[in-house]
Amino acid sequence: PDEMVAIIEKYFGGMQPNQNLPELTLTTSSKIESPVSKDVYGLDAENIMMGWKYPGATSDEALIAEVAASVLYNGTAGLIDLNINQQQKVLSAYGMSYTRPDASELIIMANPKQGQTLEEVRDIMLEEVAKLRNGEFDEALLAGTVNNLRLEQMKSLESNASRADMFVNSFINGTEWKDEVKALDKMSQVTKEDIIKWAEKYLRDDNYAIIYKRQGEDKNVIKVTAPKITPIKSNRDMQSEFL
């Protein structure tokens, strides 16, 4: 640590803070009281993306959200893993929490099987979210989630880039460094009841946004006029004397 402090002082010790930087003022977005639905068209395969909003990075809700998201999906034993992907109810599905400074979101994405409608996929995903609200999950997932996150952090901190990113993310999100360091310890104290209360408040059936990516031509696409390109003579019959 002493050597690191000396290096920091050598290269950055002369920097002075800018006292005139304006403070970031965050606006509060309106609450979603009924599902917000949008259709997007294109040639790619159909899919859905669903999102629920919850408070920003400095809140206790953000820590609970990380655990809740892993209970929903962790690639192995989450609700989506066991009840949807392993049972092949859809082609594929996954979820994640995305923490931001002002407001965060829990996102679920899913791809339909052949002959399956996007609305059917939506309803299947909502069933798993309801199970989270109702506490229909193994409490052992909570300890397993924190242990996995701790292992991931230990591995990532072997990299200089990851260590630097941890500082950067803390700065961007406006979190105290002491809270960042103790985040996993606080997550280990999250209970099943905490998850249920959090999900009942933030993951309701009426406060999500959903994007239906449908296959088809986008009638509203704006075409850009292609610029005139000057032709380039390739001189295929010539050869460099240095070749």
Where are these regions (language model features)?
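Phosphate-proximal small/polar/acidic motifs at interfaces that engage nucleotide phosphates
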Residues: 81-82
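Charge-rich, well-structured scaffold segments of protease-associated domains
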Residues: 1-20, 56, 87-242
